[in-house]
A protein has these predicted regions:
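Membrane-embedded multi-pass helical conduit in multi-pass membrane proteins
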Residues: 19, 44, 291-370
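Cell-envelope/extracellular polymer assembly enzymes that use nucleotide-activated donors
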Residues: 48-51, 80, 238
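Acidic donor-binding segment of Leloir-type glycosyltransferases
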Residues: 67-117
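Acidic donor-binding/catalytic loop of UDP-sugar-dependent glycosyltransferases
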Residues: 91, 136, 142-158
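Short aromatic/hydrophobic "clamp" motif used to bind/position activated sugar donors
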Residues: 126, 138
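Conserved nucleotide-sugar donor-binding
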Residues: 134-136, 209-223
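Catalytic donor/gating beta->alpha subdomain of glycosyltransferases that bind UDP-sugars
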Residues: 159-192, 218-221, 226-288, 383-385
Length: 390
């Protein structure tokens, strides 16, 4: 009884969309498989001086260990680390001062960045720290990022190519301690990095990934420094885009940094994902609109429902089962490749759950401009800049 399914126009369209989503998922997996993930760079004879800038605000139980990993860098070249806070009474200051005292051989200092301007406080701190940085390479990193001792050495290696001005790397959610975070880990540890690599099969990388970015100071100054980004939500995206527009190349390091987070519930994770969705929609409205086509569980599920209405239940269930099963297998393989010891952090059933929820987030990205970010209500303008909503 396949004939009614084949001739019904809507079923034909849905079958085509389900097939297209499977092809896009497979393409995404193949692009990721070709990337030399976790490979170390052998660049001991290339050790340019580096300034590490770390904007901070508040702390949790993971902060000290994450910051300590930066003091453990085994880099043969000159390097320094500058920590920036807006308030000298911030609870993170005690951690930083303690780490500086415990590691006297590391050139490190805490900078209180007062009277900051701009909607993006993190970038405002970076702009202040940039003025104090001593070296020609600037490495910026979020507070929750944890790295291996050879991280700086691996990041500088792509800069042997003089035309390369910016190096970034992938990041993974390292400690999804709640079901909500395990759900989010599917988006980060399976989908995000593989989608970035999928995009590079069509055109060179022209945006940056925010967890850790290394940039030549000269290229940064060409775009006006961090001061030109203080009102941007997606400051990492804009940093990479503007440097690429100035004719420089961007590179991906094969290292993966870890992002450690405190436990979060569904409400907190949903707000984060909605902010992320609206950010991507503003940055790349066209590609984001068509990204719904790559939802590997949504279209097969809709096809199964449509097949039920046309009397082809078994065909619909079989087609949906094969497509969603492939999506689960490939997503779990991507998570294993991305994680040390090939360890899974998300159970298989969260893969289709993530896809179905992603469809709602996709719609929500187009239905509003407000976000909640760092405890503040903000509105995102069409150009990606922020406006206080309260």
């Amino acid at each position: 009884m396949l004939f009614p399914l084949v001739v019904h126009p809507w079923n034909l369209i849905l079958a085509g969309l389900a097939g297209l989503s499977c092809c896009l998922v497979l393409w995404q997996w193949l692009a990721a498989r070709r990337f030399p993930l976790h490979q170390k760079a052998n660049a001991r004879d290339f050790t340019p001086a580096v300034s590490v800038l770390k904007p901070l605000k508040g702390c949790d139980e993971t902060t000290e260990t994450s910051l300590r990993s930066w003091f453990a860098q085994q880099y043969a070249g000159n390097w320094e680390i500058l920590f920036g806070v807006a308030d000298g009474q911030d609870t993170v200051c005690d951690i930083v001062r303690r780490l500086i005292t415990q590691n006297p051989s590391v050139s490190a200092r805490l900078v209180v960045c007062e009277n900051l301007t701009g909607a993006n406080a993190k970038v405002a701190k970076l702009a202040r720290l940039q003025q104090l940085a001593a070296h020609g390479l600037i490495l910026i990193s979020d507070a929750d990022v944890r790295v291996t001792p050879d991280f700086i050495g691996n990041m500088v290696a792509p800069l042997r190519a003089e035309q390369t001005a910016l190096v970034n790397c992938f990041y993974r959610l390292a400690n999804p301690t709640t079901t909500a975070l395990q759900w989010e880990a599917v988006a980060i540890n399976a989908d995000f990095w593989s989608q970035v690599l999928q995009s590079t099969t069509l055109k060179p990388l022209n945006f940056a990934l925010g967890a850790a970015i290394l940039v030549r100071r000269q290229a940064l100054e060409e775009i006006g420094g961090f001061a030109s980004l203080v009102d941007c939500l997606a400051d990492d995206y804009q940093l990479g885009r503007q440097i690429a527009e100035h004719g420089h190349n961007l590179a991906l390091c094969s290292q993966v940094v870890e992002c450690w987070d405190s436990p979060k519930d569904w409400r907190q994770v949903w707000k984060h994902q909605l902010r992320w969705a609206r950010t991507i929609r503003v940055c790349q409205p066209g590609p984001y609109f068509f990204s719904i086509l790559s939802n590997g569980s949504l279209w097969p599920a809709i096809l199964a429902v449509a097949a039920l209405g046309s009397g082809n239940l078994w065909f619909g269930l079989l087609a949906a089962g094969l497509c969603i099963g492939m999506r689960i297998l490939l997503a779990q393989d991507l998570q294993r490749r991305f994680t040390p010891n090939r360890r899974l952090v998300s159970p298989f059933w969260l893969v289709p759950t993530k896809d179905f929820a992603q469809a709602i987030l996709w719609l929500g990205a187009f239905l509003g401009t407000s976000i909640e970010w760092r405890g503040r209500r903000m509105k995102v303008r069409r150009d990606g800049t922020l406006l206080a909503a309260d």
